[in-house]
């Protein structure tokens, strides 16, 4: 047996699963991505197991032995997941399809995922030549009907190619244009998950361009005659900037950390910025993309702000930028942070020196809504003698503005500032 597979099946969790299956007297196989990644010597936190008749209780038995959490994914079809506590690893269990493991593997998307290792004999099962395709670094559909069975596999083909740095086999590529229109029938959240996983990779541009030339992105967003080169060019400029943030000077690391944050599960700000660049280049409104991809409210809002950032008239350079003007500008564009500078910088709309000034303000001075202030709401109620309500919120906003513009720098200054505002405001904070 290949030493990489031997290392995989000898690890504690696979070894336990295989032992339970052997003692239970039923067939079970490690399949798909975990076998592929083992052969590629790539780390993997997810294990997929196909279970033969009689092994229905295997997921619960595994969960009990490792102290993991059991989750039924589809009780009717017998799909279940076991999650290891504190390790981020999971095992997905599914019943055998088609009566034999060879028939089960033939129903899968690509040959590199149609690989299995038997829990009973530790043998590699490779009926479709997936190991050879791994060696040749190609993505090949398991059958001519693979895309008709699930059109999402078209997007997955490009995502796997980008993730593994593989090429899509010519015969598989030839199937894509005729099947791409079927993507209109695929649920938006399924497309979203695959698309954002690809966009979050550091070198997604060539694969997005190939998708566009094959009619895939046009089918996803309902855009005929999508300008593939223009859209890919816009994406390339932003992707390059996301890799090399030196244009942000001393703020590069805070910006990098910001781009890694998720705006909703599975969607980083970096990937959303790259999508915004592509949409602008393709002439696709952010609202249409948000609706098609079933984005949540926060991601929808941020995508709209990112798309509009390349059309915004940014403040002209000044020796001493007005902090009040900056506070007003960025308040109206919350929750966007430094990421909103990336598209205009990439398009040459925002000069690099001005970008650094704005990034410094956003990272060092501007306090977003909900950010930490010098005084809490309770502090303000005690200081001003206010009951809970609207006036406390108004006082918080006054303090946020004062801190963001540099008028207030210490707790004592904050107390004096609000006390003075209470005395001088035409409508007192009462």
From Swiss-Prot:
Look up the EC number in the record and give it.
2.7.7.-
- InterPro entries, per the entry: NT_sf, PolA_pol_head_dom, PolyA_RNA-bd, tRNA_CCA-adding_enzyme
Please give the SUPFAM superfamilies that the UniProt record associates with this protein: Nucleotidyltransferase (SSF81301), Poly A polymerase C-terminal region-like (SSF81891)
Q: Which reaction is the catalytic activity of this chain?
A: a tRNA precursor + 2 CTP = a tRNA with a 3' CC end + 2 diphosphate
Q: Which UniProt keywords apply?
A: Magnesium, Metal-binding, Nucleotide-binding, Nucleotidyltransferase, RNA-binding, Transferase, tRNA processing, tRNA-binding
GO terms for molecular function, please? Answer: CC tRNA cytidylyltransferase activity; CCACCA tRNA nucleotidyltransferase activity; metal ion binding; nucleotide binding; tRNA binding
Q: Which cofactor does it need?
A: Mg(2+)
Signal peptide region: none
**Entry binding sites for CTP:** 33-36, 108-109, 113, 150-159, 190
Q: Which family does it belong to?
A: Belongs to the tRNA nucleotidyltransferase/poly(A) polymerase family.
Tell me the protein's name.
CC-adding tRNA nucleotidyltransferase
Q: Which organism is it from?
A: Geobacter sulfurreducens (strain ATCC 51573 / DSM 12127 / PCA)
